[in-house]
Amino acid sequence: MAVVLDLLNKDTRPKLDAPARPRHPEKAHRPDTAIQRKPDWIRVKAPGSKLWAETKDIVRANNLVTVCEEAGCPNIGECWEKRHATFMIMGDTCTRACSFCNVRTGLPAALDEAEPEKVAEAVAKLGLHHVVVTSVDRDDLKDGGAEHFSRTIVAIRRASPGTTVEILTPDFLRKPGALEVVVAAKPDVFNHNMETVPGKYVTVRPGARYFHSVRLLQRVKELDPTIFTKSGIMVGLGEERNEVVQLMDDLRSAEVDFLTIGQYLQPTRKHHEVVRFVPPDEFKAYETTAYAKGFLLVSATPLTRSSHHAGEDFARLKAARLAKLGPAPVAASIRAVNA
């Protein structure tokens, strides 16, 4: 199938200093959708401080990719000023084509075998106490990149023994044994985002399967109950409140500990439209409902993103588990897993 480039559209046309291939070739045929003006409650500070520049320099010096940049995260200024960055491993090109995502799609390059050590070096240079590592989908790899995740976790622990590690993984769809490899590396937090309610998967996340993702999170707890599990969704894609509440029930049935809910923001005219900007009071209502259903921690605001305030949230997660279970049951579960 031929891909026709719209050279008049500044959002999709190739940059003069970039390869001719468009960033999202599978979206080139889609009609333009107007990008709505953001409401007053969605405002962020433009990046540009000295600490932001230092973080950027460390990322560049190690030839690393961050989801902060690739996904166009609105919180990049705040996070990088704190020397926090979410590392995206296994390249900058994803094998999926989700309609909400700004990450480049196509056929990825071979894995950089030195990348785990490069990430570990950057974590040490930044002095991170808590690091988040995510990846593109790599359906082209036999294990979906599970071994690469494992090697990255091990490298970080070796270089920075006091640093806690949070991972945000793809779904490892049709990759038997992949999840077990990642869990065996013992990340402190295992995050896999549901992204949206099941009724929107066909248009928003067509390469994934809703109940496979639920089962993935459930399986993590079965393999190692001491690992915190986490998942997130976007709202504003046309979902109904009752669908979000049902998703909460599905995640609690999988014993997920932490739920994040944020406003979907449309990256370009070729991406899924924003159906509605959800006001802050509705986010607060979602938070109240989620806590009532038993989540240990909930973050629900328009600018909530999976990795936003991840270090602070990890401390809150540990405190919430301790308050709920007490020190004896927590210690017993750790001993059981390590036995």
Swiss-Prot record:
UniProt-annotated binding residues for [4Fe-4S] cluster 1: C68, C73, C79, S307
Subcellular localization, as worded in the UniProt entry: Cytoplasm
Catalytic activity: [[Fe-S] cluster scaffold protein carrying a second [4Fe-4S](2+) cluster] + N(6)-octanoyl-L-lysyl-[protein] + 2 oxidized [2Fe-2S]-[ferredoxin] + 2 S-adenosyl-L-methionine + 4 H(+) = [[Fe-S] cluster scaffold protein] + N(6)-[(R)-dihydrolipoyl]-L-lysyl-[protein] + 4 Fe(3+) + 2 hydrogen sulfide + 2 5'-deoxyadenosine + 2 L-methionine + 2 reduced [2Fe-2S]-[ferredoxin]
Cellular-component GO terms for this entry: cytoplasm
UniProt-listed Enzyme Commission number(s): 2.8.1.8
Cofactor info, note text: Binds 2 [4Fe-4S] clusters per subunit. One cluster is coordinated with 3 cysteines and an exchangeable S-adenosyl-L-methionine.
GO-annotated molecular function: 4 iron, 4 sulfur cluster binding; lipoate synthase activity; metal ion binding
Cofactor(s) listed in the protein's UniProt record: [4Fe-4S] cluster
Entry keyword annotation includes Transferase: yes
Major location category of this protein: cytoplasm
Sequence segments annotated as region (Disordered): 13-35
UniProt similarity note: Belongs to the radical SAM superfamily. Lipoyl synthase family.
Name the record gives this protein: Lipoyl synthase
UniProt source species: Methylorubrum extorquens (strain PA1)
